[in-house]
Curated annotation (Swiss-Prot):
One of its GO terms (molecular function) is ATPase binding. Disulfide bonds: none annotated. Keywords: Cytoplasm, Hydrolase, Protease, Serine protease. Signal peptide: none annotated. It comes from the Bacteria. Its main location: cytoplasm. GO terms for cellular component: cytoplasm; endopeptidase Clp complex. The active site is at residues 107, 132. Belongs to the peptidase S14 family. CDD domains: S14_ClpP_2. It comes from Shewanella sediminis (strain HAW-EB3). It is an enzyme of class 3 (hydrolase). The gene is clpP. The lineage of its organism: Bacteria, Pseudomonadati, Pseudomonadota, Gammaproteobacteria, Alteromonadales. This is ATP-dependent Clp protease proteolytic subunit. Fourteen ClpP subunits assemble into 2 heptameric rings which stack back to back to give a disk-like structure with a central cavity, resembling the structure of eukaryotic proteasomes.
Length: 203
């Protein structure tokens, strides 16, 4: 059963009506855009959202393994493990995944933006990008806290290395620049190597 905010949100999603040989057919706008190989990654990156994105990526691969997929990102970030599920699927499937930042791509959102196919990562002109180190908090016995601290440090090093690979920046620059919240304009993100270009007009 849907909770009240979710049902209100779903009621606000526009519907598109199409004429087919079998009569009229209606889609919500996101399902219609999925037919055009467009996926929206919007809001907090968490497990449920990640599963939906992964399912859409796999579905579009099964439909046409040689056609690009377009992933539009407007996200403040979120769970590292959920984000890595999306990232690994982007790298795993055959189609190139072109990423486009609309609004913001922060934290894990920025990581997924940078993880798009080389030459096919873009920002719109007034979008913002933010990179930083992973956040973590844990309560419990001292030995368990130490274990979790080591895990977070390991994740931090792995994410930094992957960002270095995608941006072409040296590892020491990535480590310095992710030490605190680091905000960039679209042009700065392109200069840094997080994206390949800033798009003001289609085509």
């Amino acid at each position: 059963m849907q909770n009240a905010p979710e049902s209100v949100l779903n009621a606000l999603v526009p519907m598109v009506v199409e004429q087919t040989a079998k009569g009229e057919r209606s889609y919500d706008i996101y399902s219609r855009l999925l037919k055009e190989r467009v996926i929206f990654l919007v809001g907090q990156v968490e497990e449920h959202m990640a599963n939906l994105i992964v399912a859409q990526l796999l579905f579009l691969e099964s439909e046409s393994p040689d056609k690009d997929i377009y992933l539009y990102i407007n996200s403040p970030g979120g769970s590292v493990t959920a984000g890595m599920a999306i990232y690994d699927t982007m790298q795993f499937i055959k189609p190139n995944v072109s990423t486009v930042c609309i609004g913001q791509a922060a934290s894990m959102g920025a990581f997924l933006l940078a993880g798009g196919a080389e030459g096919k990562r873009h920002c719109l002109p007034n979008s913002r990008v933010m990179i930083h180190q992973p956040l973590g908090g844990f309560q419990g016995q001292a030995s368990d806290i130490a274990i979790h601290a080591q895990e977070i440090l390991g994740i931090k090093n792995k994410l930094n290395q992957m960002l270095a690979d995608h941006t072409g920046q040296p590892m020491e620059i990535i480590e310095r620049d992710t030490d605190r919240d680091n905000f960039m304009s679209a042009a700065e993100a392109a200069e840094y190597g997080l994206v390949d270009s800033v798009l003001s007009k289609r085509g």
